[in-house]
Amino acid sequence: MKTIEALENDILLQIPYLQKIKLQKLLSEKNQRKTIFCGSGDSLAAALLAEAFSNFRVRAADPLDLLKNKSMIKNNDVYLISISGNTISNVKVAKHAKRVTAITLNDKSKLAKACSKCIHLDYPSSGVFTSGSIGFISSALTCISLVSKFKIRGIMELFKRALLESKKIKIGKKIFIIGNLHTFPVAMYSAAKFYEILGTDAYYERIEQFLHMGLFSAKSGDTVIIFEEKNFHNSRIIKNLKKLGLNVYQPNPGTRNKIAQVIFFTLFSQLTPLFYAKKNHQKECYFVTAKKLRNASSDMIY
């Protein structure tokens, strides 16, 4: 099975999975204040979601930042997120921590063995190594459930809406994906999907920071995708960006529920590059064909 087909299968597997996902017991507010979630790539986005949904009681961190400040590792409860469980920086953090829990698909991994506890992510997949989809939504919702109570409803409706919205996007030479509090981490994840699946020049930023910085690298014909519900401020942004010749999209989740919005924007982030890959008769994800880049990455992170 080629990686684009595997990705599509994994995306579809999320629908039944999310209807029966097993969530974690909520940490007390006291314990949350001494908790750090740590990860890299998609897993850092999951950690940032936990931080946002906890109202910043917990902190999200990059593993190398923690290794440069080992007192943070020793004085807090650390949750290390890694689907493979073999990323070397996370394993190093685990070895310095007193109270450390792995959140991983691979409960036999180096990370799981280095941690005192393990939350095993149990989800179905195509069995082919492809761009992360169901693994991200599983780890993200697992992390959020440790800091906030929620229920998941209307998955099929969210999927249909995300599928519809994904086909409206016109991709320019450069893509800017912007969001705020609960959606900025998904913007990060979304940019990663455009990198991994299409090899697209994509950027993620908080909405306010984009207006201060990223906007000045935008050119007419570039694409801006706003991950936030409609409001007066965003309407003004859209009006001004369109005057610059930018393609501006604001996918509509159709709900004000924050968890539902995260799921919607996650699905949208998977379906949009998948749609373009299939449209261009692409069989493999970009990260598979870009062997030199993949080898350089793997050489450093494993």
Where are these predicted regions, by residue range?
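Glycine-rich phosphate-binding loops that contact phosphosugars or nucleotide phosphates
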Residues: 27, 31-156, 160-166, 180, ...
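Short glycine-/small-residue-rich flexible loop motifs, especially phosphate/cofactor-binding loops
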Residues: 192, 238, 274
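Active-site phosphate/pyrophosphate-binding segments
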Residues: 2-3, 7-33, 122-223, 232, ...
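Phosphate-moiety recognition in structured ligand-binding domains
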Residues: 4-5, 246-302
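Conserved phosphate/anionic-ligand binding catalytic regions in large, soluble enzymes, centered on
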Residues: 4, 45-49, 189, 266
